[in-house]
């Protein structure tokens, strides 16, 4: 009987841990990643924390610290200044698509579009998803591309796909 109760306790503990892990929202998942400290700082500076903690669902193409490092010197520091909040907000919301598009859904959209899928960001901009050399490529309005390096980081209010470059609106 003690073994059954102990086994039941372990089972409930495992379920609780999985349930708590799934309760992390987009911001919490990004904040837990050492590769996304710049993104999290930018989200805070833009005042988007509460929005991205909202119900959603959202699909976020999340640039890494290295992606931000590819921008011209001083760009990140300039964007984080309070007087540039509008520009920063525009760039960050350009990385967010309404709805939860996991890798399977993105792949299906690319296939249905004959090799390309147009995604509309919450900022109203357009991104183009395609596949190149077996990797999903996201192209911004200026023709710059980012590749998805990790897909389907699930959150309670959406999904994150890690990308290797910052996307820029027109």
Task: Spell out what each predicted region is.
Residues 5-7, 15, 19-170:
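Mature, structured domains of secreted/extracytosolic soluble proteins
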